[in-house]
Amino acid sequence: MENPVVTTVSADTAPHASDDRAVRVEEFSPLRPRAEDDPQRLRGRVMKALDHYFLTRGSTYLSGQREALSAIVKTVLDDSHQGVFAVPLVPGGGKSTLLRALLTVFAEVSRDMSDPIAQRLGGVVVVVEKTAEGDELEELCNRGLEPGEPAVARLISSTNDYNLQQGKCLTGTAATYADCLRKDCPSAAVCPLLNAMMHLAESPILILLHARLAQHLPDLTPFTSWCEADGTEHRRTLILIDECPALVREEVVSTLTINAAENDLLAQRDSRPREMRHLKWRLQGSWNHAIRIPFDRLNRQLSGEKRDAAILTPEELSDVGMTGSALRETQEWLTKYKAPPFSPAVRMTEALLQETGKFFHFGKNLEVVVPSLQTIRSDGPLRSFIFSGTAGLLPELALNPDIDLLPTELPESYERLTIHVQRDGVIGMTRTGLQRSGAVQAVALWLQRLLPEVAQRHGRVLLVTYKFLSQQLLELLEEECRSLVYTVNMPDGSGPCLPYFGGVAGSNEFRDATAVICLGMPRVEPRVYLSRALAIDPDGAHREELSHAAEALERQPCVLDMQDHYLAHDLVQMAFRSRLRHHGDTTPVELWLTQPPGPVLKLLRDYFPDCAVDECPTLPEDCHLAVSTARQRKGSPANTALLLNALLAVPEGEEITPAQLREQTGLTQNQYKEAIRAPSVKELFRTEFITFGSGKNQKIRRVSSKNAA
């Protein structure tokens, strides 16, 4: 254990050497022993556990890394400062190891709740993304317990594919979530997965998954209390969250969600008791008056609206009858009905009462969207730490007035990283652009050239694209190129595919890759960025900007700024799936990006200081040709495509006349003249054809067949 005393020195009387270099001891303040229950007494033990993990894993500290981790430990143990803190510890910087070191010591202390520090700490809540991680931490905390000794930690995890695939179904009939009968199962009353929430109060260390945390935010009071076997009650005062939780919540009000919320309400209580029938009748009447009828009025009122989305003012909602007084009355009836706080009806009513920005959106049906930024709180002290390597890029952390961003980033140069930026716009690298005729074939041609070149320097390449494209693109690659890329299996078992956006988060499977190619950008629907702009709006500036927007809301600066930050965040995470997360390594790493927005590239350069950026303005000519020969107009081949395909069918050394070309393609004289002036046709003539003669005597001879049909 480190020395459990604090030495403080007055700023006005800092020690300085006398003539004989002796320090005057009287200038020091008296030594003050730490209190017996001071959690800072654990700091030395945590660092010792951290050193042990680094040693057993064959890792060494980078310059300044141990000091940075020690400072984080000190902050975590300092309960004099309450609040929510974001810890921007870079991916690969020791976050997971630090969490395990903290839990190792917390578990040791919590085995004896008579320990003063254990009593002051009360217990810990830990939140992870995956059930497998939770299982691992539960086992870590409970390691070394004597027979009959109560568990120190418990994972609260319900029915999901992972648990069922581990054989945790009591009846043995469910192997996936879709197989589980849930409440209709004959063993539902005794199923530990369905009744997981009954075990909240059984151990000092409680392990949750992100999905459950998101359900209960912002109030985590139900997760703070627990009792020993003798009934002694304790309050957990610390929560450690691995990666940023879903702090932006979006409540959607539509005919579908109103119906679903009402059906859920009716199913909660038995209607046989007369009093309950009366209560349901009163609740339904209030619900219809406050929400259903006003929404129907709004739907009729907006039926002629030309815009797809727009901000809704409080006056517009009040005009259709969606008023605060009516909604508060519904809230009172929901309380009398004892509706669960996270039930859809309660959430919808609370959201509509919020003063945050709301907007309507036309998709398949009218939707009123109410985004909000959640915080973390309880009815007692609960210090919260969110460990996120990209916290500075996440607006819900960096711009959240309720969260303090700790200055804990490790200084590092990324000279070994080169970012290649492909800018050629002949192929739109969006989801829509890559579904256009010929786009995927053109991309495959580019990759056929690029992959062998990159693999020669780096070995296997992490090529990531959209999920809808991941199987098709893999099949289009020649066998030689398929062996140069990482592959994964489609979740539905339909076969191998390329890794895809949204499917590699948190994976260490590609940690040895030194080249990453992102084919496309990991964008989500524009409406999502609009929601985030309204939710993350501490001073109301975004709402004001969007209220006066003359153009589409998703094109407004505040929404585009949200998009840029989230794209940069996702691309940084993608880069760290590779060997780049091996800090201190000198192996060169390449990141290929296709048509990233300028602001996104700037954010990446700021995040990766000293990295090199290589702009690639054009794709190979055969990629351009592949797009041009497949171009369509109103479902039929374009005139340019018809002419190009006819020219490519001419064997090398053979001749053809314009009249023959018009006959083969069905083009008129004017259409032929227009098509022959197209840049792609001009380029093909420049590289593979010569013409001689003029007028009716003109002939066209193919002299090269490098782009043979």
Per-region residue spans from a language model:
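ASCE RecA-like P-loop NTPase motor cores
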Residues: 2-709
